Amino acid sequence: MQAWSLWGGNGEPFSSEGKWKVVAEDKHSLSTEIHLVDFVILCLGRFSDVPNIPDFHPNKGPEAFHGEVIHSMNYADMDYVSAANLVKGKQVTVVGFQKFAMDIAMECSNANGVELPCTVIYKTEHWNLPDYLPWGLPLAYLYFSRFSELLVHKPGEGLLLSLLATILSPLRWAFSKFVESHVNKKLGLAKYGMVPKHGFLQEISSCMIATVPEKFFDRVQEGSIILKKSPSSTFSFCQEGILVEGESSPVKTDLVIMATGFRGEKKLKDVFVSPTFQDRIVGSPETILPLYRECIHGRIPQLAVIGFSESISNLFTSEMRCRWLSELFAGTFKLPSIKEMEKDVEKWDKYAKQYASGQYYRRSCIGALHLWYNDQLCKDMGWNPKRKKGVFAELFEPYGPMDYVTS
């Protein structure tokens, strides 16, 4: 493999050089099946199975707490009645401030009201959206059109596109401020000290946008939800509840729900038995996941990953990748050399670090470059990347799944 210049030795999806051994275990019967296959497609996703639990100093973790600690994954696995019974009549603390955290806080608020308010401990404020119509204009016109993508620097862009992105940077800033002003006005973020320090473009480029549940901040105002910022990610448990750094008294609680996300990279890594493949699939912690077209690893043959890299519409993006992969199987195109694939990954890594938030570039988000990314897939498959009728429509109308129904 080290000597190959082409993927799998020949640049094609299938090779006579080897097969994958897939071991599947039935966890109920504990029976095991072994399959030899020519190609493996990992459709794992990153938001399940392996919870992200913060590390704690000895005797400062959940073991020091007298109550119950669960992850949001466990809460989501419950049926509605069981989940309602779990939080009813309890002082609940939710750790996190993304979609899971806000939804769970709302359910706790519904169950217990102001008598037993739910405390939400968060580290970073986010531009979570009340709707997708900033000041009545569909968000797609601002971020999912060819014109909107002219405002950002793109991986592999030429000199002209680079100059345009630089010249139009004030408009890029104006788009962000337009959305931010709507969110701030509608949710009253300033009133609660919840205005993020970063811009909306960084948020969408990191795929960190969530939809705020209806009347969430009304519950904050009435007191059934309490927002408490932890100055850093450091907090610890004590017998009565959670100790936030810089505060002398703990947040007293009966139940802690950790809405702290998932360790998708660990799940992906642990699929492999080989330490070599384990290291290669996740790459360096200082770069994005090293996948060409967000699907293929240049140094791991006869394998594809679907649905791990994020976008604003993951189903749409995964469908495009599936079509790209099917055309690769059909022989419509061949992959470039391994070096070329790795150079392309480096360009996307540079883009991610330029626009995504520091701790989130590893999410390999294409949130602000849907069209640029889909254009590359289309060109590989021999499709015309321009899908609209007319110059004005092509430049200013948003693109969506229906634009790619036919080849």
List where the protein language model places each region.
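Long alpha-helical segments found as membrane-embedded helices
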Residues: 345-353, 365
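A catalytic-pocket lid/entrance helix-loop region that shapes and gates access to the active site
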Residues: 127-159
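Flavin (primarily FAD) cofactor-binding/catalytic cores of flavoenzymes
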Residues: 1-136, 161-339, 356-407
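Alpha-helix boundary/capping detector
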Residues: 144, 329, 348-351, 403
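Post-kinase regulatory C-tail/linker adjacent to protein kinase catalytic domains
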Residues: 138-141, 340-348
